[in-house]
Amino acid sequence: MINVVAIMGRLTYDPELRTTPTGVSVVRFQVAVDRNFQRAGEERKADFIDVTAWRQTAEFVSKYFRKGSMIAVEGSIQTDNFTDKDGNKRKSVQVVASNVSFCGSKAESGT
């Protein structure tokens, strides 16, 4: 079976590095990705995709990327089932990043 995803878009907020109780670095961020099509007379729509990165990838993202940065993410899709505080069953979908890279100019990325 294959579970591979690649997205490219802009970060919607600054990533914030966290550390698990066992000392593993993790960062969660969201990427706005424009859809490939646009209906006549309408604005282009975007999808907002949640991404999680671990260890060195998390540290790299938190150090070099900010809100508005263009980013390319390679990884896999992961789903989680959970019950919210009101007792409703929910499902979340996210990309778990295995690789990230710059997509904008040096001036745009701030490096």
Question: Model-found features: residue ranges?
Answer:
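Single-stranded nucleic acid-binding surfaces, predominantly the OB-fold ssDNA-binding core
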Residues: 1-111
